[in-house]
């Protein structure tokens, strides 16, 4: 018997008296335990039973509360955390729950029960069991609904609906959130909006799903989805595994995935098709955000790889007839069985029998050249990467914004603007050409020989054990061998780290270049825009570091520790600074002839040992005595040099930032020439 009115009952005086018998044990709220009439606005924190003669309005079911609607009616109940409501039929009467709000509590609709208009809020749960019904349920963020019965017209706003065996959901609208269709569960006419998804698990069935732009349909192996419609900008995630059965329309074209064969599938916006062993995909379109994965013993025929799409061909997988756009990403290995296609520039490419030819890598594309295989004429653009494994060989690779990682051998690589070739331990690069804006990085135990370093190219390396480098640049030949670097050119991002116990000679640091010396260097030239440091790297200070004949011609040089012997600083942007020693075990020493000219600046920190230095400041070159806060106590900050020659030069004895009456003092055994002292 179906009743919709809460005022249905005609009750005797006796029944009214019974309905009014209320018992409340100590500590509990008074409520009607057995409802056979109509009760309003009760708070239930114990057990309440509503049979076919009863109805409740606006019940509040709180922690430990349990309302059993056993053939009766519940209108407007609110179920808080720890509260529970169970709705079931009794005999020929259906139990009804209307407009329930679940705030962290739970509601179970059992056989013969009906719910209408339930709202499930955060941490609230609703279970619709076999032969039970739920209509117009709303599942908000954090709420969950489990369906083994019948659910119609559900709205999902950030929550989750799970459809189990024998469960049927019809007319669901997923505005955000998820609908999971388990084995034996069915969903019909589901609308999936942006940011939401429908998941069809093995043995589950979806019919007539409509996936809007930004929405996602996920079909697991063995899942069934018939009559689906995917808008432009929606995502299909599926595979060709056993039992998978999908058909529908994308962009007004029919597609299918059935019997281990996918035809005319469009992948975009996180969509993904996985082609498993012994199956195939035909005429796939991979658009921006889409991905096609081809596994071992699987085949993809006539794939169109558009800008922003990814085609991933795994070991022993095959993909033939590829049409690759200029920004389509191919991810492949030279152990693929067969990969063929045409690039956007009309060049044919292939991977067969362990040899890759003319591969274009861009925008996330990766070619892995495996051991005992080869690649030739690979084009690596921005976002692309070629990985040359141990015992593999790559020949004629061109890097234009992309990267090549060399663990094996790379021959005749050309590095253009934005390109990077990294030679790893035991890797070898032969006849690499580095053009302006390109970078060659050689790591410990790496080898790079016959390099051509053109103007504006960057070389990044160190004097570490095992590094072997040779080549030519605008200043002649250069090399690193046996921990000795000779005639290196560092510019435009290039850098050299001279490790403790190693040496560099005749290095040139140009604009954008950098050199750090923890060992020894001689005749280093630091030009405008170049940076040089002695005695410090990002990891350590080195007291035994030493530099001789340092030439700072418009660049910047800083001595943190060690000894500088003989130096010149020139040009208005030229700057040489000797920092206050960090501690007693990392002293800073200056000795020999130091010449500051042409408006250059030379700064000496307090505590630097300059007693063996002969200073010349000429042509408005300036010497600054910079004590900072290092001169404490009551004594003056003392500076000593062996000799000081001024030829229109300047000396600044800036006041220490300490107690009044403390001064910088400069003592020299010989003072000559003409210039200015500023106190």
PLM regions and their residue ranges:
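Long, low-complexity, polar and repeat-rich extracellular regions
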Residues: 1-679
């Amino acid at each position: 018997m179906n009743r919709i009115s809460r005022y249905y009952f005609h009750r005797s005086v006796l029944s009214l008296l019974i309905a009014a018998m209320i018992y409340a044990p100590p500590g509990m709220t008074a409520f009607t335990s057995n409802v056979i009439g109509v009760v309003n606005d009760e708070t239930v924190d114990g057990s309440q039973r509503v049979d076919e003669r009863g109805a409740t309005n606006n019940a509040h079911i709180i922690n430990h509360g349990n309302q059993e609607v056993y053939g009766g009616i519940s209108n407007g109940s609110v179920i808080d955390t720890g509260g529970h409501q169970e709705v079931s039929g009794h005999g020929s009467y259906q139990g009804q729950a209307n407009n329930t709000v679940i705030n962290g509590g739970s509601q179970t609709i059992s056989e013969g029960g009906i719910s209408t208009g339930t709202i499930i809020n955060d941490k609230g749960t609703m279970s619709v069991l076999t032969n039970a019904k739920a209509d117009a349920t709303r599942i908000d963020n954090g709420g969950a609904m489990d369906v083994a019965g019948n659910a119609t017209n559900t709205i999902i706003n950030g929550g989750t609906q799970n459809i189990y065996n024998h469960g049927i959901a019809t007319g669901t609208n997923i505005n955000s959130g998820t609908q999971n269709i388990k084995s034996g569960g069915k969903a019909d006419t589901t609308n999936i909006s942006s940011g939401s998804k429908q998941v069809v698990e093995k043995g589950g069935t979806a019919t007539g799903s409509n996936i809007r732009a930004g929405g996602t349909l996920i079909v697991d192996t063995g899942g069934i989805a018939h009559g689906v419609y995917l808008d432009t900008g929606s995502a299909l995630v599926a595979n060709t595994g056993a039992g998978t059965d999908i058909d529908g329309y994308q962009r007004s074209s029919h597609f299918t995935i059935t019997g281990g064969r996918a035809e005319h599938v469009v992948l975009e916006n996180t969509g993904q098709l996985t082609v498993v062993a012994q199956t195939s995909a035909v005429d796939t379109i991979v658009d921006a955000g889409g991905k096609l994965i081809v596994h071992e013993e699987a085949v993809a025929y006539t794939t169109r790889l558009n800008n922003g799409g990814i085609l991933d061909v795994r070991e022993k997988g095959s993909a033939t007839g590829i049409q690759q756009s200029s920004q389509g990403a191919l991810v492949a290995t030279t152990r693929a069985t067969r990969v063929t296609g045409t690039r956007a520039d009309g060049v044919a490419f292939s991977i067969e029998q362990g040899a890759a030819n003319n591969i274009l890598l861009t925008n996330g594309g990766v070619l892995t050249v495996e051991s005992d295989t080869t690649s030739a004429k690979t084009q690596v653009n921005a976002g692309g990467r070629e990985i040359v494994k141990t015992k593999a060989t790559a020949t004629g690779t061109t890097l234009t914004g992309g990267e090549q990682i060399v663990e094996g051998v790379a021959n005749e690589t050309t590095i253009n603007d934005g390109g990077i070739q990294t030679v790893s331990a035991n890797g070898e690069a032969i006849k690499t050409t580095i053009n302006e804006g390109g970078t060659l990085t050689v790591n410990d135990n790496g080898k790079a020989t016959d390099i051509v370093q053109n103007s504006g190219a960057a070389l990044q390396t160190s004097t570490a054990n095992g590094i072997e480098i040779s080549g030519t640049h605008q200043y002649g030949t250069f090399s690193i061998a046996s921990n000795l670097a000779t005639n290196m050119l560092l510019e435009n991002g290039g850098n050299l780290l001279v490790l403790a116990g190693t040496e560099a000679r005749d290095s040139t640091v140009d604009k954008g270049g950098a050199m750090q010396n923890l060992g020894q260097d001689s005749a280093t030239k630091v030009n405008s825009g170049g940076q040089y440091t002695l005695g410090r790297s990002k990891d350590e200070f080195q007291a035994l570091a030493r530099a001789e004949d340092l030439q700072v011609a418009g660049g910047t040089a800083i001595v943190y520790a060690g000894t500088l012997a003989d130096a010149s600083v020139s040009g208005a942007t030229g700057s040489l600074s000797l920092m206050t020693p960090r501690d007693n075990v990392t002293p800073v020493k200056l000795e020999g002839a130091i010449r500051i000219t042409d408006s250059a600046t030379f700064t000496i920190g307090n505590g630097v040992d300059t007693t063996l230095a002969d200073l010349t400041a000429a042509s408005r070159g300036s010497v600054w005595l910079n004590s900072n806060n290092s001169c404490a106590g009551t004594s003056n900050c003392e500076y000593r040099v062996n000799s000081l020659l001024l030829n229109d030069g300047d000396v600044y004895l800036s006041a220490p930032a300490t107690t009044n009456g403390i001064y910088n003092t400069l003592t020299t055994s010989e003072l000559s020439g003409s210039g200015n002292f500023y106190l």
